[in-house]
Amino acid sequence: MKQLWFAMSLVAASLFFSANASADPASGALLQQMNIASQSLNYELSFVSITKQGVESLRYRHARLDGRPLAQLLQLDGPRREVVQRGNEISYFEPGLEPFTLNGDYIVDSLPSLIYTDFKRLAPYYDFISVGRTRIADRLCEVIRVVARDGTRYSYIVWMDMDTKLPMRVDLLDRDGETLEQFRVIAFTVSQDIGSNMQALAKANLPPLLSVPGGEKTKFNWSPSWVPQGFSEVSSSRRPLPTMDNLPIESRLYSDGLFSFSVNVNRATQNSSDQMLRTGRRTVYSSVRDNAEITIVGELPPQTAKRIADSIKFRAVQ
């Protein structure tokens, strides 16, 4: 039954992209199949995660038990760091820290968020371009580029195993083609036995769910007049900033289904100034005007972050 469901899901994904003229049908269908395979198969990946901060060796195991996802991400070198997913709860185990659990749909740490993206949503704003085929981890792979049509975002190159549709390599590139991050599989296994081997995790006692205080919901007297196509507001909040004498900060979170960023506005202080910092995929851009400090934080090129900040419009308080 699991194999039948998986096969029918792949067919459905292909049908959608065959009828959608806004994306390369074949490449779009393959990417949607990668999304389905990553969340439905029982498999184990040994991979390296390469960023500007260094290289990590990790193992990721995924299975579906009783219709629920069960996954484990384990750091293989140095101190033992582990992330466990059971259903919609993600538990973190770090040396020197009290274990805790958060709500979530999947493990994002060291895994490309692209893997879990709904490519049907991206189709109007991104091009999916077939680059050819090559071998990764001794597997023949389809190579596909994921590029925003308006040129305001980073891009991806995906190497996907032709048989299982699992990702074997994912590169995140900036607008100049420089690699910001790389996910690269060294070895992998697809087997129903992996689910059996993870039974202990299914029964393990996990740390309690961490209560995350929600921000105060209120209407803001500001909003961006421009964001890249496809981005929409996901949430907004108003909360005190402990590091700045509980100065209230207002935030709006935006996402296009692949990348995300937040717009944060607080009253300017004597220490506020214009500044820009980029670390890997993450940009922090701050500007000061109209007695307010505007900070853009997210997975955006610096030029795009600046354009969003410059577009902020303030309205008179009623």
From Swiss-Prot:
The lineage of its organism: Bacteria, Pseudomonadati, Pseudomonadota, Gammaproteobacteria, Enterobacterales. Pfam families: MucB_RseB, MucB_RseB_C. NCBIfam families: PRK09455.1. It comes from Salmonella typhimurium (strain 14028s / SGSC 2262). Disruption phenotype: Slight increase in basal sigma-E activity, retains acid stress induction of sigma-E. Homodimer. Interacts with RseA. This is Sigma-E factor regulatory protein RseB. One of its GO terms (cellular component) is outer membrane-bounded periplasmic space. Its main location: periplasm. Residues 1-23 form the signal peptide. It is found in: Periplasm.
